Amino acid sequence: MAGNTIGQLFRVTTFGESHGLALGCIVDGVPPGIPLTEADLQHDLDRRRPGTSRYTTQRREPDQVKILSGVFEGVTTGTSIGLLIENTDQRSQDYGAIKDLFRPGHADYTYEQKYGLRDYRGGGRSSARETAMRVAAGAIAKKYLAAKFGIVIRGCLTQMGDIPLAIKDWDQVEQNPFFCPDPDKIDALDELMRGLKKEGDSIGAKVTVVADGVPPGLGEPVFDRLDADIAHALMSINAVKGVEIGDGFEVVKLRGSENRDEITKAGFQSNHAGGILGGISSGQQIVANIALKPTSSITVPGHTINRFGEEVEMITKGRHDPCVGIRAVPIAEAMLAIVLMDHFMRQRAQNGDVTTTIPRW
């Protein structure tokens, strides 16, 4: 199975399945001399881990990360960093009844078509459980980018179903179980989630992730444009069906005179481009949105076929998220951090000595 690695100089390779013994990853390209402990990684893992509220899956995994290599006496050595998280709360028996069925909306059918077999326990490698290691690796990138360049990466839920959520207060995001930046909508989200759990159904969501403090110059035209790599990274997250950079699909409504981000001595007058022009960071805030589909693991009966080609009705039992968008927030942050870290290293390798007299804001 290929496709387990992202990045060129800052490289993250993950392994493991939902109901396997453990999840792990190898992080290559981490600069030496960075203070790093397991506690530095645990904060974001705790934000992502299951079972932390009644609105997410009740699979209870502590997600305690272990640093196996690449750190000596509390600092990175420049060698590969090995990370491991043990699975402790698998309930594989929940999936015995569907081992021969293809869950509609899941990767069961496509995995079996591709490989001729599949791990039916919790989706195996296709499960979002794999993203725990992305978050751990992303925490390394976030720490370095913040300490070295003052870059702040943060995300929030900006829509659930038909409820839009304005970014009113970033401080509120960590104060509620929805990563919601609009305190006036918490009750509406709670009511929606309670109704979904009662019905045994699920709902889609939109997540926004931003990076402040990114300097101009990151991105490798033409095929490794910064926005192309960000879209690639975000699109690789489970359940993501759409990615927008800046205004995204809203630009189809605008005229060129409205969409262009005009520049004065005071700086850019707007940011429709989401901080990226020509595939290169402009120095403005980088903004990306992702759309996540409603999970298909629901107790509402649905139609499918089994491995023998017979039509059957099925209900997906187990412990699942009514809205996968909630726990996607720290995952999106991690993927943006990984891409920015990789492009920082690539920029430094080729253009580390480049200086200009062009203003920066």
UniProtKB/Swiss-Prot annotation:
Example of a GO biological process term: amino acid biosynthetic process
PROSITE patterns recorded: CHORISMATE_SYNTHASE_1, CHORISMATE_SYNTHASE_2, CHORISMATE_SYNTHASE_3
EC number: 4.2.3.5
Catalytically driven reaction(s): 5-O-(1-carboxyvinyl)-3-phosphoshikimate = chorismate + phosphate
Keyword DNA-binding: no
A GO MF term: FMN binding
Cofactor(s) for this UniProt protein: FMNH2
Residue numbers binding NADP(+): 48, 54
Pathway: Metabolic intermediate biosynthesis; chorismate biosynthesis; chorismate from D-erythrose 4-phosphate and phosphoenolpyruvate: step 7/7
Keywords (A to Z) from UniProt: Amino-acid biosynthesis, Aromatic amino acid biosynthesis, FAD, Flavoprotein, FMN, Lyase, NADP
Classification via Gene3D superfamilies: Chorismate synthase AroC (3.60.150.10)
GO cellular component: cytosol
Residues that hold FMN according to the record: 125-127, 238-239, 278, 293-297, 319
UniProt cofactor note: Reduced FMN (FMNH(2)).
InterPro entries: Chorismate_synth, Chorismate_synth_AroC_sf, Chorismate_synthase_CS
Pfam family, one: Chorismate_synt
Functional note: This reaction introduces a second double bond into the aromatic ring system.
Subunit structure: Homotetramer.
NCBIfam families found in the cross-reference section: aroC (TIGR00033), PRK05382.1 (NF003793)
Entry similarity comment: Belongs to the chorismate synthase family.
HAMAP family, alphabetized: Chorismate_synth (MF_00300)
Record-given protein name: Chorismate synthase
The species this protein was found in: Klebsiella pneumoniae subsp. pneumoniae (strain ATCC 700721 / MGH 78578)
Gene designation per UniProt: aroC
